[in-house]
Amino acid sequence: MYAQTCCSGGIPLSNNIGMSVEEKGTFQLSLNYDYNNLNTLNNGTEKLNDDSRLRITNSILFNISYAVTNRLSVEGLFTWVNQRRVISQFGNENLDQTSGIGDGLLLLKYNFKNGLGKNSNIELGLGAKIPFGSSTETNNQGITLNADLQPGSNAWDVVYFLSASKQANFRPSLTFSGRIIYRSTGTNNSYFENSSYKFGNEIQTFLGVSDQFSILKTLATPSISLKYRDAKQDEIDGFNLDNTGGNWLFIIPDFSINIKPNLVFSTRAELPLYSNVDGTQLTPTYRITTGFLFKIKPKSKLLNLR
């Protein structure tokens, strides 16, 4: 949402939606592991010389998509998450962590083929983030942890999706793409039982280029993209919460390879180029995502010749 937290450490929902719209009847299944390391403390754009705080999020992400028609598809994302926060001071280490089912997402997408000319696609989508995860986990002392460490949010969000891609005329395997995801967040009205909490609205934009090459009798697809993320400040009881929100720019190198015609292995890194946070916050140091994509295409219809 990739991340619904003051320090960008949450489940990467928004980063992991937008599977391609395939021919009618095609199922797509994707299983990924996501590791997000935050060990950089910023005050605004200034990096502070303080590595005493560490935040790690481990996520298991399961996507499923079905092509209802050649243009319309429905996609779901289900998650499991482990969040860890470590503070080391004066030789002592304080660890808070939670694990469990995270929030999910349901997205309906429509593909306008050749919307930007020959060999192009435009996809529009509308969806919802569904609050499956717990938002009341406690530490070892029985104290309820803050919202940014909870597996879930106890709030429904509305998700707007727009993507576009176009193949180069001079090299059809070369593809330029862009994607915009806007998340309008809902409110948890039972935060600490009698308060309300709202994560900041968020927009993410991606610009990328990919190409395909034949390697060892199979296809490999390297790509590079830029991601810009802007998150507004969180709110508690209707008031802006300091040290939340900001904007970031990342570079994302990605490599995927076809193990079989219907099975793809991929891995990518997300590295920060620019971070500008509100107040003082932990900000991403690096993120690694790796996993598999499996496609089940409909059986070809047999022609009955009489």
Which residue ranges define each predicted feature?
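Outer membrane beta-barrel transmembrane domains
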Residues: T40-N42, L48-D50, N188-R306
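Surface-exposed strand-loop-strand hairpins of Gram-negative outer-membrane beta-barrel proteins
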Residues: D34-S59
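Outer-membrane beta-barrel biogenesis signature
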Residues: Y2-T40, G117, N121-E123, K297-R306
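Outer-membrane beta-barrel channels and translocator barrels
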Residues: K24, N36, T69-R71, V81, ...
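Outer-membrane pore/translocation modules
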Residues: Q83-V86, G91-K198
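Residues that define the transmembrane beta-barrel architecture of outer-membrane proteins
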Residues: G25, I56-I60, T98-L106, S120, ...
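Transmembrane beta-barrel strands of outer-membrane/channel proteins
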Residues: L31-N37, G76-W80, L124-I130, F176-Y182, ...
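Residue-level signature of outer-membrane beta-barrel architecture
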Residues: Y33, Y66, F78, Y110-F112, ...
